[in-house]
Amino acid sequence: MKLTMVASPPTDRRLRTLKQLGADFAVHYDMAGLPDDFEALRAIRAHYETFGLPWKVAESGPAIDRIVLGKEGAAEQIEQYKRIVGHLGKLGVEVVAYNFMPQVTEDAMVVRTSFDARTRGGARTSGFRRSEL
């Protein structure tokens, strides 16, 4: 098993601490602001590697609010998403933990109508039904 941790923001102090705690790999969180330029992404990877932490996981993924909500600009976001994922693959990032929950308001990203919905095997989760709003 390999230990992967997030440091957000990835300051030098936090990355040193992750390495001291035994992290094998870095998780980069807050990709909404990630550049889609290959060299800029390579610089992010180099920052992690300075601390002996290969960048293997990108959590949250590029912005996809227009895609999820079917708004104008969705096609451009799809192209940007594809470009960033392609760059991440070339840089050795193996996992993109995407987040398909759109920003609903300035303060809320997720809207739920239930905190006791059932899913596979009877497990409980949160849920959303438009009819319950």
Predicted regions located by residue number:
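Short, acidic/polar
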Residues: 7-20, 37-44, 76-87
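Active-site-proximal loop/turn and secondary-structure-junction residues that shape catalytic pockets
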Residues: 9-11, 32, 61-62, 100-104
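Glycine-rich, proline-tolerant flexible connector loops at the mouths of alpha/beta enzymes
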Residues: 29-43, 104
